Amino acid sequence: MGNLVIGSRGSELALWQANHIKERLKKECFIESEIQIVKTKGDKILDTPLNKIGGKGLFTKELEELLLKGAIDLAVHSLKDVPVVFEKGLDLACITKRADVRDTFLSVKFPDLMSLPKGAKVGTTSLRRSMQIKLKRQDLDTESLRGNVQTRLKKLECGEFDAIILAEAGLCRLEIQGAKYRKAFSVEEMIPSMGQGALGVEMLKNHKHFATLQKLNDEESAFCCHLEREFVKGLNGGCQIPIGVHASLMGDRVKIQAVLGLPNGKEVITKEKRGDKTKAFDLVQDLLEEFLQSGAKEILEKAQLF
């Protein structure tokens, strides 16, 4: 049998992720593999904010189509990009140990968000980040920032933005300092996206190596990420919707923090639940119920208009 084929997007970060899985497959599963680069819709359309492109799976659909055809054996994703409902026959074979989940502030001139002058331009791809920035600083101008990590940093250095917000995990993986000023938000200051910091490996469920990849699975990270994905699924949300959710374990206890609102920060719901790990999925349902009672569906419908 030939090498397994790993499907990956072509950015430096995506290829770091694919190579990370390739190395672990060889070392831990004794499986040789090769990487095939695939351009997704989200990679091709760079002049439009992600939420305006429309559809789910902007960074995964083309990879999933190749999985279903058998043209590739596995697809490596940033888990935060993976839709909560899979195409029939596909599923996550594993979720890797989570890297840093936090979002990070970067600027050439200003040390942190609160030091930015009124009307300063902040670049982000994410409505979730925009919402939480506006919640703290309604006077700031949040604008869409597309492209790979290096492209976004160049736009900051050229003065197109006063500050930008990126995922800390990506900066760490690429060993990028980023800018003169770099400060990670705490989870309490900016609740991350579902699955942020983790990689998800997607395969056909009936693939002969599907179970083998459980060797790469991190039990705690997978448990927390599945809780987060269950919350987003309950709201019919996707990765381009302004929802943040983060689950964490402290021994046999679990904490789930969530935020949802309009990108302009005008209507926002923030709640958290704590409880026994054995009842974690019940806690998610309780949290969902509280969000729905607080008008979550109506807010998400309004958010679609932004």
UniProtKB/Swiss-Prot annotation:
It is an enzyme of class 2 (transferase). PROSITE patterns: PORPHOBILINOGEN_DEAM (PS00533). Pathway: Porphyrin-containing compound metabolism; protoporphyrin-IX biosynthesis; coproporphyrinogen-III from 5-aminolevulinate: step 2/4. Keywords: Porphyrin biosynthesis, Transferase. One of its GO terms (molecular function) is hydroxymethylbilane synthase activity. Binds 1 dipyrromethane group covalently. Tetrapolymerization of the monopyrrole PBG into the hydroxymethylbilane pre-uroporphyrinogen in several discrete steps. This is Porphobilinogen deaminase. The lineage of its organism: Bacteria, Pseudomonadati, Campylobacterota, Epsilonproteobacteria, Campylobacterales.
